[in-house]
């Protein structure tokens, strides 16, 4: 199969990323108005455009300024970055494995990061230490999956997938064990809430961590977008066109692991974003990754930010965002699967 018309972008997609970028900026401003302490949109715009970049000395006696700059701004930035990273990861993984059912959690990174986060909570470590251990554990899970795949003698797609399932299952069992051993009055509620996913603990330090990882890994994925297109054609065709399939696949999975580990480390479990958002982006711009990756990033930021707005504004008590992304994502994915099942992954 050659790079046919399906690999070309759809008509009118040149402006999609621009429109989505404008939409995400407006949604971020609107999100700053939401919450238990309402702040009018005009006040939000004034605060943002007069104090950004963030001043070292702020007006801490001004309640709206504190709410917007100190409480809501880091959360909204963190949510947006995580949504963008997860969506780009999902789009890349679906291209690498030529399978629309693949998500960025396939290598066991999410479970590994969850194990690190739970262990840090059990040890009463401070928030940034939880982020660090969760991030390191996620990368450790990826290394374990790679090593296990190597034991098969051939790093095939199937070996990588099965290795990720094995490592993820093992890490999940350890998480369950730690929950069983946790103090039911103090530690267990914190662990359960963290695993369900929440951005309530967002800080500018966490934003800096995720921003650094997202900029690095996202830029690397964009630089490799043409190579991902080759992998989407299949291993044989990609190799015939000059791609080092094994090295490229492993490198891409490493970049995805960085993004997923960064997200889990700051917010706990947030699923379905990397699975459904690339499908929506593909419906807008087609499967060609030079447009699919940036479009997925914008849609991912919009989707997760909208879910977080609902999570913190719909009820008196904040809803764990992982519950919302699952509750909304599952029926959306079911609809997309029904809509596209007869069309296949890539049309001839």
Predicted regions and their residues:
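Alpha-helical transmembrane segments in inner-membrane proteins
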Residues: 2-348
């Amino acid at each position: 199969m050659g790079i046919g018309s399906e690999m070309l972008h759809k008509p009118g997609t040149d402006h999609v990323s621009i429109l989505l970028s404008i939409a995400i900026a407006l949604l971020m401003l609107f999100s700053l108005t939401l919450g238990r302490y309402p702040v009018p949109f005009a006040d939000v715009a004034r605060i943002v455009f007069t104090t950004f970049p963030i001043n070292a000395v702020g007006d801490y006696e001004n309640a709206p300024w504190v709410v917007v700059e100190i409480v809501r701004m880091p959360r909204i930035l963190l949510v947006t970055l995580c949504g963008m990273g997860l969506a780009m990861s999902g789009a890349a993984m679906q291209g690498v494995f030529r399978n629309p059912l693949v998500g960025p959690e396939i290598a066991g990174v999410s479970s590994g990061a969850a194990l690190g986060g739970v262990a840090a909570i059990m040890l009463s470590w401070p928030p940034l230490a939880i982020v660090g251990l969760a991030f390191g554990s996620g990368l450790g899970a990826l290394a374990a999956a790679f090593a296990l795949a190597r034991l098969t003698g051939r790093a095939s797609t199937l070996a990588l997938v099965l290795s990720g399932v094995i490592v993820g299952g093992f890490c999940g069992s350890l998480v369950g064990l730690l929950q069983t051993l946790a103090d039911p009055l103090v530690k267990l509620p914190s662990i359960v809430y963290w695993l369900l996913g929440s951005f309530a603990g967002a800080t500018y330090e966490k934003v800096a961590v995720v921003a650094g990882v997202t900029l690095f890994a996202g830029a690397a994925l964009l630089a490799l977008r043409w190579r991902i297109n080759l992998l989407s054609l299949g291993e044989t065709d990609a190799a015939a066109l000059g791609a080092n399939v094994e090295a490229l696949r492993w490198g891409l999975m490493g970049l995805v692991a960085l993004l997923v580990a960064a997200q889990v480390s700051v917010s706990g479990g947030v699923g379905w974003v990397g699975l459904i958002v690339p499908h929506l982006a593909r419906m807008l711009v087609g499967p060609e990754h030079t447009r699919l990756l940036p479009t997925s990033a914008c849609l991912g930021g919009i989707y997760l930010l909208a879910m977080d707005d609902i999570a913190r504004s719909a009820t008196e008590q904040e809803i764990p965002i992982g519950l919302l992304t699952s509750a909304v994502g599952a029926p959306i994915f079911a609809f997309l699967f029904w809509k596209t099942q007869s069309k296949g992954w890539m049309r001839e």
